[in-house]
């Protein structure tokens, strides 16, 4: 008996997805039990978006005008997919991974697309590691209990009075 399995797809790899893990077919029996509460809630939210997007993508191909909620789900799916891409032999600290995965649920990325993530992901990572206004957010990730707490904290960085509004 195994603890789970990862399903890799060559088609995803050919589209630039690295690692090319098919989330919908990959299973972990203990993964959620070993995650902290924040990561667990955020991963649930991400799986819901990816699942909803998979259902909507077929329908969206036949419609020229999509409802705003459908557009939001499909945009979030594209952002999440781009965020999940990672260069070989690179490490991203857990706090930054959590922040990156929360960003599609903030207003910061509401009008951005996957090209923005592709271009600016390294800049965003660097900012959360070194910018004095953002480092406290990075350090606080391990103390947060919910994804909503993190999203509110990230939203607060957009306020005009804040030293660094991304």
Regions flagged by a language model, labelled:
Residues 1-166:
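Conserved catalytic/coupling modules of large nucleotide/cofactor-utilizing molecular machines
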């Amino acid at each position: 008996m195994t603890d789970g399995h990862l399903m890799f797809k060559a088609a995803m790899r050919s589209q630039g997805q690295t690692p090319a893990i098919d989330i919908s077919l990959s299973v972990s029996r203990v993964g959620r039990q070993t995650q902290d509460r924040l990561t667990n809630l955020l991963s649930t939210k991400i799986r819901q978006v990816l699942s909803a997007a998979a259902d909507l993508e077929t329908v969206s191909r036949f419609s020229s005008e999509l409802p705003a909620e459908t557009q939001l789900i499909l945009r979030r799916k594209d952002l999440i997919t781009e965020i999940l891409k990672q260069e070989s032999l690179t490490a991203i600290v857990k706090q930054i991974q959590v922040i990156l995965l929360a960003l599609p649920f903030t207003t910061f990325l509401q009008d951005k697309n996957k090209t923005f993530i592709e271009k600016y992901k390294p800049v965003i990572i660097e900012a959360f590691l070194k910018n004095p206004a953002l480092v406290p957010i990075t350090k606080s990730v391990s103390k947060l209990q919910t994804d909503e707490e993190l999203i509110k904290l990230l939203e607060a960085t957009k306020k005009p009075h804040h030293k660094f509004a991304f």
